[in-house]
């Protein structure tokens, strides 16, 4: 029996904007996309900011886009989850934070807050530190010490003074907190097993060892004089008038590590939490009975308490298709294969029953502007065979070109990339229509729509422009206010399947 597949076709990095200058999507000759756009119900979707679980105004990316598409709901990223918790008052009721504060009140000990001291939003956000200071003041914790990791990478290389001054203002405002140590992230946030770096940060915090300064700003000035900028500032100790450290981490203290991204938080956390730690000698004063809090789940190896536990994504599109006994195919070239598999399945590696995957190798070139078609033709050829074989009820396909070539910031190759994808799109959609199937043509975020700045310089980053959605079915109407999280419910609707309660997105088809 002939299958009538519903195919979700993701044109990676393909968004829409009216301005045609520097816009490879608008300038490309794409007769197939234009034909489907004119002939079938279409709309645009928001693919950035809070619509995909990021802070407002922040551009989307492929990982976040595919997570939202597959989950059929807004998947809040860690930064946004914490921001919302602060905004709605949940942060102050967080049981893990309150337990850490009760621990130090019961033992008459100190609370240490450490993390990256910037608003870069990649590993941490300084506003989360301020929220912790405010909470400590509210909870009556008297001894609160800050161990600031200096950034200079996700923000400018000499921005530490502005963050330190801002922090000092907040300390005055809340009446709690003192800066105890400062360390460039090169030391305290190493992830490459350079344990000699981590040891320097550890010994500053626990033993008060390292260069000493009366004033945190003096530490930065001194480093700058020696040509050492924020990221590389040596772990340094702030001292009182008598030369003793403002604070060291001791037995029965509590630590709240307010970074939310795990990769650069794991080593320093292991140093404090692992009883069988062997990477360097922690010495006789290694603190015992520490109450160690990670803002998010860092790793199974970190023996600490987690303030914001991971959210499990149940009933993603793949799981629902599988539960209903449908056959599904995921297909992409190497660059976007993890996105149509792992991210589309909510961070799950294993296939669901009835799920097949086809990986087509991306071309071995230094940069994709040298081969703008990438492996789109090979992906298409493989998929056409599968459509002809009548095996699948649902297909999820990604074309990587507009994004990967768009990252070059070169207009001509990106136009060629869009044109190659359009040629392939025509073949795939026509094959699906011949089988009586339906295609949902969309994208995960923008990129190729803006590859030059207004001044004509390369613009290599993603954009915040809306992405298209076309459903190749006559006689329906699409909502105009959709988000990526509405695509899975739409797919289920077209397949005649019920939408699980976990999917809080809504079908784009107007009822």
From Swiss-Prot:
Keyword set, alphabetical order: Glycolysis, Isomerase, Manganese, Metal-binding, Phosphoprotein
Alphabetized InterPro entries for the sequence: Alkaline_phosphatase_core_sf, BPG-indep_PGM_N, Metalloenzyme, PGAM_B_sf, Pgm_bpd_ind
Family classification: Belongs to the BPG-independent phosphoglycerate mutase family.
Essential cofactor(s): Mn(2+)
Protein task: Catalyzes the interconversion of 2-phosphoglycerate and 3-phosphoglycerate.
Pfam families: iPGM_N, Metalloenzyme
Phosphotyrosine found at: 36
Annotated protein name in UniProt: 2,3-bisphosphoglycerate-independent phosphoglycerate mutase
Keyword Metal-binding in annotation: yes
Cofactor binding note: Binds 2 manganese ions per subunit.
Origin superkingdom: Bacteria
Binding site for Mn(2+) 2: 12, 62, 444-445
Pathway: Carbohydrate degradation; glycolysis; pyruvate from D-glyceraldehyde 3-phosphate: step 3/5
Any one Gene Ontology cellular component term annotated for this protein: cytosol
E.C. code: 5.4.2.12
Record field: catalytic activity: (2R)-2-phosphoglycerate = (2R)-3-phosphoglycerate
Biological-process GO terms, alphabetical: glucose catabolic process; glycolytic process
Subunit-structure text: Monomer.
Molecular functions (GO terms): manganese ion binding; phosphoglycerate mutase activity
Cysteines engaged in disulfide bonds, as pairs: none
Keyword Lipoprotein: no
Binding residues annotated for Mn(2+) 1, in chain numbering: 403, 407, 462
Active site (record annotation): 62 (phosphoserine intermediate)
SUPFAM superfamilies: 2,3-Bisphosphoglycerate-independent phosphoglycerate mutase, substrate-binding domain, Alkaline phosphatase-like
Organism: Geobacillus thermodenitrificans (strain NG80-2)
């Amino acid at each position: 029996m002939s299958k009538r597949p519903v195919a979700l076709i993701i044109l990676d990095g393909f968004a829409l904007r009216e301005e045609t200058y520097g816009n490879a999507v608008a300038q490309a000759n794409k007769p197939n996309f234009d034909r489907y756009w004119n002939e079938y119900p279409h709309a645009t979707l928001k693919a950035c900011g809070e619509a995909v679980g990021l802070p407002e105004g922040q551009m989307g990316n492929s990982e976040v886009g595919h997570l939202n598409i597959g989950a059929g709901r807004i998947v809040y990223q860690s930064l946004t989850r914490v921001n919302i918790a602060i905004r709605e008052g949940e942060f102050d009721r967080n049981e893990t934070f309150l337990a850490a504060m009760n621990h130090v009140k019961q033992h008459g000990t100190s609370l240490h807050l450490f993390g990256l001291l910037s608003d870069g939003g990649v590993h941490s956000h300084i506003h989360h530190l301020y929220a912790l200071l405010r909470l400590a003041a509210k909870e009556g914790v008297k001894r609160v010490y800050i161990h600031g990791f200096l950034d200079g990478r996700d923000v400018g290389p000499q921005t530490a003074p502005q963050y330190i001054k801002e922090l000092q203002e907040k300390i005055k405002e809340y009446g709690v907190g003192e800066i105890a140590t400062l360390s460039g992230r090169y030391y305290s946030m190493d992830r490459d097993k350079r344990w000699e770096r981590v040891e320097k940060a550890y010994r500053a915090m626990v033993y008060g060892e390292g260069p000493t300064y009366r004033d945190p700003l003096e530490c930065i000035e001194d480093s700058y004089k020696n040509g050492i900028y924020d990221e590389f500032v040596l772990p340094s100790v702030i001292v009182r008038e008598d030369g003793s450290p403002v604070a060291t981490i001791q037995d029965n203290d509590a630590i709240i590590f307010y970074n939310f991204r795990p990769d650069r938080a794991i080593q320093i956390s292991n140093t404090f939490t692992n009883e069988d730690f062997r990477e360097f000698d922690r010495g006789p004063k290694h603190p015992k009975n520490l109450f160690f809090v990670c803002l998010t789940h860092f790793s199974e190896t970190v023996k600490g308490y987690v303030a914001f536990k991971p959210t499990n994504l149940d009933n993603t599109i793949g799981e629902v298709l599988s539960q209903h006994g449908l056959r599904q195919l995921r297909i992409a070239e190497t660059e976007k294969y993890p996105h149509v598999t792992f991210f589309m399945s909510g961070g799950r590696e294993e296939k669901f029953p009835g799920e097949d995957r086809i990986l087509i190798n991306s071309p071995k070139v230094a940069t994709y502007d040298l081969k703008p078609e990438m492996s789109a033709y090979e992906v298409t050829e493989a998929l056409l065979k599968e459509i002809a074989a009548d095996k699948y009820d649902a297909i999820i396909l990604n074309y990587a070109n507009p994004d990967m070539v768009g990252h070059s910031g070169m207009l001509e190759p990106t136009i060629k990339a869009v044109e190659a994808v359009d040629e392939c799109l025509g073949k795939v959609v026509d094959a699906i229509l011949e089988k009586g199937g339906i295609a949902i043509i969309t994208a995960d975020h923008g990129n190729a729509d803006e590859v030059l700045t207004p001044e004509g310089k390369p613009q290599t980053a993603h954009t915040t422009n809306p992405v298209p959605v076309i459903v190749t079915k006559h006689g329906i109407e699409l909502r105009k206010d959709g988000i990526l999280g509405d695509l899975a419910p739409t797919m289920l609707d077209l397949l005649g399947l019920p939408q699980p309660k976990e999917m809080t997105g809504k079908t784009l088809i107007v009822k």
